[in-house]
Amino acid sequence: MRYRHYKGGVYEVVCEAILEADHTAVVVYRGQDGQVWVRPREAFFGTVDVGAERLPRFAPLDPPSR
């Protein structure tokens, strides 16, 4: 599934995983440039304050599959 970062970049979720060190749930995702990133699941699906607005850090671009 693809998501748009609040700063404008588009990313595709590769998978969700568990961090070995402390069992934190993480999201593995890839940018359009091919760079792979890992972020705690709570942060990936969390919100950010931008000016007076609270926005999702990553907003879904693709409709949910049924």
Task: Give the ranges of each region predicted by the language model.
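Mixed-charge, low-complexity intrinsically disordered regions
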Residues: 1-66
